[in-house]
Amino acid sequence: MSTPTLFVGIDVSKENLEVYFQNKSFELLNQAGPLAKFMHQLLELEIPLQLICEATAGYEEALLRSAHHHGVPIS
């Protein structure tokens, strides 16, 4: 039996990311350091992941770079 994929919804803005997963939401600074920490926390779950975000005037670039660097799928 395969483990279901955890979908993580992310609303992107210039300063912050609004993250929603596991029936919780929180804000995360849209900066490399906080994003790297968040990616590590997600990977520690050791389950299939899929990040979902909407491109917003280029503000998603830090998120895309971090996800790619850590091997986390994003669409």
Stretch-by-stretch model annotation:
Residues 1-75:
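Phosphate- and other anionic-substrate recognition elements at nucleic-acid/protein interfaces
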